[in-house]
Amino acid sequence: MSIGPMTGLFLHEAAVGYTIIFSCSLIACMVGFICAYLVKTPYKAPVKREPISLDRFILLKGIPAGISLLLLSIPYGMTTNYVAMYAKQIGITSSTGFFFTLMAIGMAVSRLFSGKLVDKGKITQVIQAGMYLVCFCFFGLSACGWIIDWSLPMTTIFFFAISLLLGIGFGTMFPAYNTLFVNLAPNSQRGTATSTYLTSWDVGIGIGMVVGGYIAEVSTFKIAYLAGAILTVFSLFYFYGKVAPHFHRYRLR
């Protein structure tokens, strides 16, 4: 999620054509497909399938958490698609490919401590900590559009510091959210739990791409990121008031 945008921006800034950039994406997809094809799993005897129902595709107990995650992924979708244009719009001249480089570093750093805390059962606490950081980052990202009038060098430093913190925030929440969904599901629905987690994330990113582009078209990107920051606040309060109590009540492990 960080290496792809980073590589694409570096290639684009090096005057590489879009045909080559998308060809690289296609090659990466083919390599991923081959790697997935080579994965071997133990044979499992076919089991009788239950009638098709909603809970075969969506973990019903995970819907509250899915809503919270969806709200968080909307501004993330704005970031992965529009942060380069936003930086150009407000006047940041440094390569925005480094934004995703630092974001990837932040995600890697977060795994050094977040996984251990999740293993100790502090799932909701880890998610809330990540949410606080992400809320700050998106408000800060929006604020860059205003504070750049005072100092370009300081805004540039702040802009890239946000990317590092954003990587830490999302990197902290990703495994914790996945664990939260899985712990709400019986063993027979672990796949459904992961599917619900990923669907919520992907739908939010799609909404972020559409809504972020529309807001930027009628206004500016800094307003789009301000709207995204407000959504993270809604997600935080919803998680604190609904998702966390729901999880502690219905968790199975």
For the regions a protein language model found, what residue spans apply to each?
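Intracellular juxtamembrane helix-capping segments at the cytosolic ends
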Residues: 172-185
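C-terminal membrane-cytosol helix-exit motif in multi-pass small-molecule transporters
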Residues: 26-45, 238-243
